[in-house]
C-alpha cells in the first residue's frame, strides 16, 4: 500500500483512539497518515472572527483538533509522515472523497451508553457502506493501539463478489493470527 491511511477526527476521545490505531497501522504498513477534520458549524452559526487571531472561530477549533490529533499520532511514531486538512463540509462527504485515494479510512464512534455502543453513528454507517476502500470503525473506550497478538476477531461485511474490504480484512486477520468473521446482511 502506498496510499495514505485517512483518519477522521472530531475532537472526541473516540476519534483520538482512532488516531492511535491509524498511526500504528500507517507505521506498520509504511504509509503516510492523513488526518481530516470536517466541520459544518459555519452553516448554522455564521462566521465569527476569533479576535486575536483574525480567523473564523471554527478554523481555530479545527486547527486545535488537528494539532492534538497530530501530536497523538506522533507520540508513538515520531517519524510518521502526517498531513492534515480541515474542510468546511459534511463529514461523510469529506471522508467518502478522501476514500478515493486512501488505503483505508479509520474513524471512531461516539456512543453515549450501552445501547448506543452497539450502534454505528450515521457518519460511520454512511462511510462504511459507500466508501471505495476498506473502512475501520474503532469502537469501545479501551486502548485501541494496534499491536500484534491483541486482536481476537476481525469482522467484515461481505457482498456477492470479493471486495477490497474482504481482501483487506483477510490480510489483516492473517497478519495478526486473528479470527475472521464474514457477515452478510
Predicted ranges, named:
Residues 107-126, 130, 149-151:
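Glycine-rich, Arg-bearing micro-motifs that act as flexible, cationic patches
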Residues 108-109, 135-140:
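Short beta-strand elements of ligand-binding domains
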Residues 141-150:
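A short, basic/flexible loop-to-alpha-helix module at the beginning of a structural domain
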Residues 53-64:
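A short acidic, glycine-rich active-site loop
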Residues 1-52, 151-185:
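Small/aliphatic-rich secondary-structure junction motif
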Residues 1, 14, 71-105:
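Structural beta-alpha unit
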Amino acid at each position: 500500500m502506498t496510499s495514505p491511511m485517512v483518519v477522521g477526527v472530531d475532537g472526541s476521545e473516540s476519534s483520538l483512539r482512532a488516531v492511535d490505531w491509524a498511526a500504528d497501522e500507517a507505521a506498520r504498513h509504511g504509509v503516510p497518515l492523513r488526518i481530516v477534520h470536517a466541520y459544518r458549524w459555519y452553516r448554522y452559526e455564521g462566521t465569527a472572527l476569533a479576535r486575536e487571531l483574525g480567523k473564523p472561530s471554527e478554523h481555530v477549533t479545527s486547527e486545535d483538533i488537528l494539532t492534538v490529533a497530530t501530536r497523538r499520532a506522533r507520540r508513538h511514531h515520531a517519524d510518521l509522515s502526517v498531513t492534515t486538512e480541515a474542510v468546511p463540509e459534511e463529514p461523510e462527504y469529506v471522508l467518502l472523497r478522501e476514500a478515493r485515494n486512501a488505503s483505508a479510512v479509520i474513524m471512531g464512534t461516539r456512543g453515549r451508553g450501552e445501547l448506543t455502543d452497539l450502534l454505528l453513528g450515521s457518519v460511520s454507517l454512511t462511510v462504511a457502506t459507500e466508501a471505495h476502500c476498506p473502512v475501520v470503525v474503532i469502537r469501545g473506550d479501551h486502548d485501541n493501539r494496534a499491536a500484534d497478538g491483541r486482536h481476537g476477531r476481525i469482522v467484515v461485511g461481505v457482498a456477492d463478489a470479493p471486495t477490497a474490504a474482504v481482501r483487506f480484512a483477510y490480510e489483516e486477520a492473517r497478519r495478526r493470527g486473528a479470527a475472521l468473521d464474514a457477515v452478510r446482511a
